[in-house]
Amino acid sequence: MASDVKTDRRYTKDHEWAKVEGDKVVVGISAFAVNQLGDITLVNIDVKPGDTLTAGKAFGTIESVKTLSDLFAPVSGKIERVNSDLNDKPELVNDDCYGAWMIELTPSDKSEIDGLLDSAAYAELLKTAAH
């Protein structure tokens, strides 16, 4: 499972990832989350460009054949883009969870990124989650 952890991004304990791209942060869910969820049937993003999001608050839901889960913002900021491709093709998350981003935002406090788990810490978290 640790091999499914990308080193170019940070993670939350709820299994969202945050990748810094210039002055923006792109957000999605990890391979561990996808494996736990199973086949994704619906991605519902409740925010739109221009909205302000607070770290730890839900920005949408993801539904699979097994369950419905909230999607949480890893950092606070202003929504710049939403991946509308996921409306019609939620299976993109199963196919490539690190390519199928969900939201892009401009962080209001870049230090929040440093508070997220780096890839090594996230891999350690997954070891305990697997037991």
Identify the meaning behind each predicted range:
Residues 1-58, 96-131:
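Acidic, low-complexity mobile loops and tails
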Residues 10, 52, 63, 68-73, ...:
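Small beta-strand-rich domains/subdomains or short beta-sheet motifs embedded
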Residues 20, 64-65, 74, 108:
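A short, compositionally biased micro-patch
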Residues 24, 76-78:
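Structural motif
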Residues 80-104:
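Aromatic- and Lys/Arg-enriched surface recognition patch
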